[in-house]
Structure formats: structure tokens, C-alpha cells
Swiss-Prot record:
Annotated source species: Pseudomonas syringae pv. tomato (strain ATCC BAA-871 / DC3000)
Entry note: cofactor: Binds 1 zinc ion.
Keywords: Cytoplasm, Endonuclease, Hydrolase, Metal-binding, Nuclease, Ribosome biogenesis, rRNA processing, Zinc
GO MF annotation list: metalloendopeptidase activity; RNA endonuclease activity; zinc ion binding
Name the UniProt record assigns to this protein: Endoribonuclease YbeY
Binding site for Zn(2+): 111, 115, 121
NCBIfam families: rRNA maturation RNase YbeY (TIGR00043)
Taxonomic lineage of the native organism: Bacteria, Pseudomonadati, Pseudomonadota, Gammaproteobacteria, Pseudomonadales
Enzyme Commission no: 3.1.-.-
Gene field: ybeY
SUPFAM superfamilies (UniProt xref): Metalloproteases ('zincins'), catalytic domain
Task performed by this protein: Single strand-specific metallo-endoribonuclease involved in late-stage 70S ribosome quality control and in maturation of the 3' terminus of the 16S rRNA.
Cellular component GO terms held in the UniProt record: cytoplasm
Ranges for region Disordered: 141-166
């Protein structure tokens, strides 16, 4: 069972809770245990502040992943962590990349969920593994390959703040 806490702190239109639940369940499908996570939808001001605080980057990014650092046996429901998604950035990226809003949102949510499960894209091998899983999950939902038109290694990855900052 997925316990999802959707916090809306942005006035920019975003998908509904049912879509987020579907995308999270797909991204967390390999996890058999119950899971709890929070998705906070923010505007660019809050997105920039969080990215600056945790990553020392002075711009709003699409998705920040904050994995929980609490042993599962200390909680009734295993807390995976939090995703902070900057709504205007995700919507703008979809338009700039010629992707449907729904497909790009699904990609960002699944990408963030995979970070909460421990996947990363720091080196090429990890990135290839993570991207392959994203492609598979998105294809099962009927969405196109999010990396099909990429000619460089610069993908719209979400960012996971280092645990050194927690």
C-alpha cells in the first residue's frame, strides 16, 4: 500500500492526485513493502530556495528527491522520503522539449521515486541502468521514451541532495 501525502504549494496547474498515485505506484512497483512518501508541488521561488539550500545551485530544478534516513523497523509504515517538484519548471520543460505534459510529469515522478529507492545517475553505468528502468516503466504506462530525442548526455534528471547536507 502506498501512503501518499500530496502538498500543493503552487498556483500553477498540475496533474491530480490520482495521476501522482499511479505514477508513484509504477515507480515503486519493485518495492513489495508498504511505503509512505510526500510530494510537495512548489513554485519557482520555493524551488530555487530549496535547490540553493541543499545543492548550492541558485535556480529552480524540476525535481528534488529527499530519501528518508530512518530504518524501516522504527516506523509503522516505511517512510521512503519526499519529492519536491517545481510545477512551472516541469511544465516549461515539457513545452521546450516538445513532450506532452502528462508524459513529462510521469517521467519526473517515476525518476524521483527511483531516487528514493536508491537509484542514481552519477556515473554512466548507473545512469544507463536508471534510464532503462524509466523507459520500461513509462512504456508500460503508454508514454514514449523520454530520452529518444536526446543527442547528448544532458538529460532532465532530478537531483538528490547529498546526505552530507541533512
Amino acid at each position: 500500500m502506498l501512503e501518499l501525502d500530496l502538498q500543493i504549494a503552487s498556483e500553477t496547474p498540475a496533474p491530480d492526485e490520482a495521476r501522482f498515485r499511479l505514477w508513484c505506484e509504477m515507480g515503486l512497483r519493485q518495492r513489495s513493502a508498504d511505503s509512505e512518501l510526500t510530494i510537495r508541488l512548489v513554485d519557482e521561488t520555493e524551488g530555487r530556495e530549496l535547490n540553493h539550500t541543499w545543492r548550492h545551485k541558485n535556480y529552480a530544478t524540476n525535481v528534488l528527491s529527499f530519501p528518508a534516513d530512518v530504518p524501516d523497523d522504527m516506523l509503522d509504515i516505511p517512510l521512503l522520503g519526499d519529492l519536491v517538484i517545481c510545477v512551472p519548471v516541469v511544465n516549461r520543460e515539457a513545452a521546450e522539449q516538445g513532450k506532452s505534459i502528462d508524459a513529462h510529469w510521469a517521467h519526473m515522478v517515476i525518476h524521483g521515486c527511483l531516487h528514493l529507492l536508491g537509484y542514481d545517475h552519477i556515473d554512466d553505468e548507473e545512469a544507463e541502468e536508471m534510464e532503462a528502468l524509466e523507459r520500461t516503466l513509462l512504456e508500460e504506462l503508454g508514454y514514449p521514451d523520454p530520452y529518444a530525442d536526446d543527442e547528448s548526455a544532458d538529460h532532465p534528471h532530478s537531483d538528490t541532495p547529498s546526505k552530507d547536507h541533512e
